[in-house]
Curated annotation (Swiss-Prot):
One of the GO BP terms on file: L-histidine biosynthetic process
Keyword Translocase: no
GO molecular function list: ATP binding; phosphoribosyl-ATP diphosphatase activity
Protein's name according to its UniProt entry: Phosphoribosyl-ATP pyrophosphatase
Pathway(s) where this gene product acts: Amino-acid biosynthesis; L-histidine biosynthesis; L-histidine from 5-phospho-alpha-D-ribose 1-diphosphate: step 2/9
Catalytic activity: 1-(5-phospho-beta-D-ribosyl)-ATP + H2O = 1-(5-phospho-beta-D-ribosyl)-5'-AMP + diphosphate + H(+)
Pfam family membership, one: PRA-PH
Coiled coil: none
Subcellular location: Cytoplasm
Keywords: Amino-acid biosynthesis, ATP-binding, Cytoplasm, Histidine biosynthesis, Hydrolase, Nucleotide-binding
Entry annotated with the keyword Amino-acid biosynthesis: yes
Protein's organism: Marinobacter nauticus (strain ATCC 700491 / DSM 11845 / VT8) (Marinobacter aquaeolei)
Similarity-based family: Belongs to the PRA-PH family.
GO cellular component, one term: cytoplasm
Amino acid sequence: MSDVLERLAQVLEARKDADPDTSYVASLHAKGLNKILEKVGEECTETLLAAKDAEHSGETRDLVYETADLWFHSLVMLSRLGLGPKDVLDELASRFDLSGLEEKASRNP
């Protein structure tokens, strides 16, 4: 499963410095972090709305689509900041032996 994320991370990294006129990812980077964060926020809202719709209708196609957009733009954000999916997956893996309450208590204030 993480192979897809790793391949996507490689593509995002390669397109970071591409021509903004020919690459959506490059155009986001050219506009700066605030534009990338704006897109993450927009996709987050769309994902939340799709989840509400899915709960009422039972149809999940839009939820999956919007979640993919959210993940994509989150990966662009991570790339901008020198991080990638491995950093997030490593963090998730480190939480496997903790209960949710233990993990929350271990966070720095």
